[in-house]
């Protein structure tokens, strides 16, 4: 059994060398490969709207979902394929966007570039390889227009320091988030921690050690803290944190160096193959993106029209190519594989992501509350003791305008 697990783990490691925080939808991994050559767009790629045609005609009632809906299996916002139609900018404009990753969770952006959707909006796209915590201050000064990241401590600390940086659109959530009976990214633990592994009591994690790639400042700490709260546990106090690279977490669990870990795609499949030894304890919150794009003064002022056009392009890419089980579409998988420099088989081996450009109500507040609670651990994660109001850290207007709801 252990030999088979190790062989499978070695086979999977190649798919995750750059995934320190994919489950967090963000991070500071700067080892990002260069942009791959653009694959040829499928024939059905939309063209600019003909004169007189409503560019938002395909964005009906389903293009906006009640932001308070966090239910398992809730609908996600969608327009018809090809919508919203392009509305080219009057002047060629460059959008400078940073990301510490070039991985599948930013496929809407990478495929918008590869399939010419930015070109249709008269946008030049400049990809900057930079982790979120390093980029956020440059977003605040307007040197970077948009940053891929997570709703993490560095965002709120930047706001606390006077920068006007806001979460402007979401990214994705695992389709089965919230259903612990389905193996997926989440907190996995050794079965021998629990008196009844078939129904694990989170309270029994008290006194154990959890592996984390980043620590308490990552947005992943939010869903973990949320799961621990009903059991009366505080991450960093009742459950110790040990920083371990994501690719080493399975072996750390196997060797009992840690008793739990947030395990990413596709490494959790090794643990799922040994249900008598490991159990899934909690997942990402259901129906809730916890990362996405973050904008500052340039998107709110001088480049607002371009930032709206950028969102129009990525929303159109989601509606056209990345809806449903898109891993069944060989052309789309091939395009993603080329853009992120991975094998198509590695991509197809994991579930398709559920892309969601919307931001749920209260997500930013709940994340702040988690970071504030960590002061009990003796580690200063944020330097304020009350959450900022949502309208100071969230701005939904760019994506709403992109679908004709501005």
Task: Give residue ranges: language-model regions.
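Short, low-complexity, disordered segments immediately C-terminal to signal peptides
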Residues: 27-49, 56
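Pocket-lining segment of extracytoplasmic ligand-binding domains
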Residues: 247-338
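Secondary-structure end/capping motifs
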Residues: 301-383
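Short, glycine-/small- and polar/acidic-enriched structural segments
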Residues: 52-238, 242-243, 259-265, 280-287
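Bacterial N-terminal signal peptides that target proteins for export
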Residues: 2-13
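Conserved C-terminal helix/tail region of periplasmic/extracytoplasmic solute-binding proteins
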Residues: 54-70, 372-406
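C-terminal motif of bacterial Sec signal peptides marking the signal peptidase cleavage site
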Residues: 21-25
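Hydrophobic helical h-region of N-terminal Sec-dependent signal peptides
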Residues: 12-20
């Amino acid at each position: 059994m252990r030999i088979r697990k190790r062989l499978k783990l070695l086979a999977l490691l190649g798919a995750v060398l750059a995934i320190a925080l994919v489950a967090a939808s963000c991070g500071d991994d700067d080892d990002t490969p260069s942009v791959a050559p653009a694959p040829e767009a499928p024939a059905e790629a939309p063209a600019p709207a003909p004169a007189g045609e409503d560019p938002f005609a395909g964005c009906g009632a389903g293009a906006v979902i009640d932001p308070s809906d966090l239910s398992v299996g809730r609908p996600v916002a969608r327009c018809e394929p090809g919508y919203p139609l392009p509305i080219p900018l009057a002047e060629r404009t460059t959008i400078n966007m940073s990301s510490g990753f070039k991985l599948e969770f930013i496929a809407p952006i990478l495929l918008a570039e590869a399939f010419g959707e930015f070109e249709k909006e008269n946008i030049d796209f400049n990809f900057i390889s930079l982790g979120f915590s390093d980029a956020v201050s440059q977003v605040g000064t307007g040197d970077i227009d948009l940053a891929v990241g997570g709703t993490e401590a560095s965002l709120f600390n930047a706001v606390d320091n006077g920068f006007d940086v806001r979460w402007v659109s979401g990214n994705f959530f695992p389709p089965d988030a919230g259903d612990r009976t389905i193996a997926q990214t989440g907190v996995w633990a050794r079965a021998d921690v629990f008196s009844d592994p078939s129904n694990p009591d989170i309270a029994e994690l008290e006194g154990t050690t959890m592996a984390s790639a980043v620590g308490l400042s990552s947005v992943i700490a939010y869903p973990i803290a949320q799961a621990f709260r009903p059991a009366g546990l505080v991450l960093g106090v009742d459950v110790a944190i040990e920083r371990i690279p994501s690719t080493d977490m399975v072996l750390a669990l196997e060797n009992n160096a840690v008793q739990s870990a947030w395990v990413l795609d596709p490494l959790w499949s090794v643990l799922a193959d040994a249900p008598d030894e490991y159990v899934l304890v909690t997942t990402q919150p259901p129906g809730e993106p916890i990362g996405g794009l973050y904008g500052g003064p340039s998107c709110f002022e001088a480049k607002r029209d371009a930032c709206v056009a950028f969102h129009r392009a990525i929303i159109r890419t989601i509606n056209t190519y990345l809806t449903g089980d898109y891993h069944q579409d060989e052309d789309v998988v091939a395009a993603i594989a080329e853009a992120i420099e991975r094998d198509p088989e590695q991509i197809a081996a994991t579930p398709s992501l559920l892309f969601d450009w919307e931001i749920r109500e209260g997500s930013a507040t709940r994340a702040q509350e988690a970071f504030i609670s960590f002061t009990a651990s003796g580690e200063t994660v944020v330097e304020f003791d009350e959450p900022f109001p949502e309208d100071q850290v969230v701005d939904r207007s760019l994506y709403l305008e992109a679908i004709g709801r501005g």
